[in-house]
Structure formats: structure tokens, C-alpha cells
Amino acid sequence: MKTRNWLKVVEKPLEPGIPNSPKAITESKDIPGEIRMFRGTTSLAYGIDEITEAICEPKARMNWVERMTENILIEGKPNQGKWLSYESYGLSWPISVRDYVFQQTLEKSMYEQKNKTIVKVSSIEHPDYPEKTDRVRGELPTCVFTLEAASEKETHLDVMVQVDPGGSIPGFLKNMIQKGWALKTMRALNGYLKNH
């Protein structure tokens, strides 16, 4: 599969109106025949473990992930390195509620003598969570949060996603909807960390 290079979509302050706020950069990559991929990068003024917990723990995610209405841990636990979850998202009319079943993994390592954490999320099927008639099952081929500690209180974040919300939404509209995902995600995560 041939892919094109990442193209910058936007560069904005992570915290609008705050002097010297880190930049939040959003990029996109077209993959022929597939939904566009989006990536965001920034620096967060929090330790790597604190950010990892906010990204992984279902109760924390309910407080910052946009439009999330359910986050059910099916099996495993984030601190065990692998877990399965069911998530649903309430969207604005006329778009139906979307739901997903995910496998998530957490890997910690050292990279150039600094802590590194990678959280990978992808869609799976699970017999206890079949598709529901009142929801549209989305597909998440890939979502990766890569965290690299710059210091005890600063972490570089790179988040990449390719998601198909499913249903009858045309591909170009799906790409338009997802265009702002990375910036919203980085800002929401930072806002949660700032207030918790």
C-alpha cells in the first residue's frame, strides 16, 4: 500500500490565549482507497505516567473524550498491559450514535535513556458486544498514542488515528469530520490534566 507524506493541516496553541503555550500541530496523510489518517503532536506539562493513566483508564476517559457516553471495561486492565473495552459516542442529529469494541495495549520502554509509552487501540469483534440496531458500529483500524518523557513534568505526545465512523456518511464527509480530531483530543486531554 503506497502512502503519501504527512501534510500539515494546522498549527495552533495548545491552550488558546495562554502566552508561550506549546504548539499543537495537526497533520494528515491520504491512503488511497481508505479513510484519511490524522496525527497530532504537542508537549504536555505533565509526567508520562499521569498522562498514560488519563489516556487508558475508563473513568478518566469519560471526563475528557469528546462525546463519549459509555466506556465499559470488558476484560483485562490497563495496568496489565492489555484490555478490551466497549465505547459509545453520542453524536449530533441527524448522525446516529456510534459504538466500538476495542482491544487496547500499553507498552512501556526506555528510549534514548528516557521513558516511552505507547498505547495502541484498534477495533475487534466480541461475542458479548454484538452490533445493536439503535447504533452504528464504527471501525478503528488504528489509533496510537506515543508518549516520550522530556523531563519529570514534561512529555511529548504524538497521537495518530484512522477511524471510519461507519454508516452511510460519504468518505469525503468522514474525512472532514475527523479533520479536527487530533487538535480537539490534545486540547481535551490537556484540559483534563490541568483540572484533575
Where are these regions (language model features)?
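Eukaryotic helix-grip
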Residues: 1-196
